[in-house]
Amino acid sequence: MQITALLTGRGNSTLKDKNILEVCGKPLLAYPAEAARKSSLIDEFFVSSDDEKILSIAQDCGFKKIKRPADLGRPDSKHVDVIKHALGVIKEEGADPDILVVLLANTVCVKTEWIDECLREILKTPTISAVVPVVSDLDHHPYRAKKKDEDGFLEPFFDFGDRDISSNREEIGDCLFLCHNFWVLNVKKSVYTDGGFSPWKFMGDKVKPYELDWSIDVHTKEDLIRSENWVKANL
């Protein structure tokens, strides 16, 4: 069973050079990179980016560089296309990953034990297509979502028909949001299938949640401050 880590991050972002901005004295991408490097279960390490600064810093962390084409570095580029491109390059080098740990460069919220526990889930149950971190957030349950009608008034985002929806959040059931820190993919049952649920079809149709208390990915300067606070409290 071959397990490979793939760190992903592009240079073209709204917060300039966010993936390499310092958080508590280290480049942002070093946090997921180092967490993966400390895993005893991962065999190989690659980084995919269109940005040479990202590639060089990740290489310093022990990751082999994959320079992605420009069309995979745009804001509207899809993660699945980045993953497939990287897997193609990895296979050209003679490797054929069974499990791929996709690491997102713009987060500090990754721990080695989290990665290993997700990996062990798939190793124990090979029918699982992916294991992904999630957080519970009942305050933002989709049943509570609204939109504006043509006259500018609020209306339910969904048409519930005659169904009565409770305003008590404890009565409306689970609401789990996918984290953007890392995803563990059982490659043959996920990336190359089309049976998953939108918008992450590449994760396959047997996705196990790995519940976290909190997670953040960086898009603003305020996110950097929150990330620093998390690092000081957790690492």
Annotate each predicted stretch with a short phrase.
Residues I42, A95-P97, T127-I128:
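Short, high-confidence coil segments that cap the C-terminus of an alpha-helix
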Residues G195-I216, K221-I225, N229-L235:
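Catalytic donor-sugar/metal-binding loop of nucleotide-sugar-dependent glycosyltransferases
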Residues L28-E44:
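A short, N-terminal amphipathic alpha-helix
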Residues F45-S49, P133:
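Short internal beta-strands
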Residues L21-E22, V47, V102:
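Conserved SAM-binding loop
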Residues M1-K16:
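N-terminal nucleotide-binding beta1-loop-alpha1 segment
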Residues D81, V108-W200, K208-E211:
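Conserved core of the sugar-phosphate nucleotidyltransferase
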Residues E52-V101, C109-E117:
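Short phosphate-binding loop-to-helix
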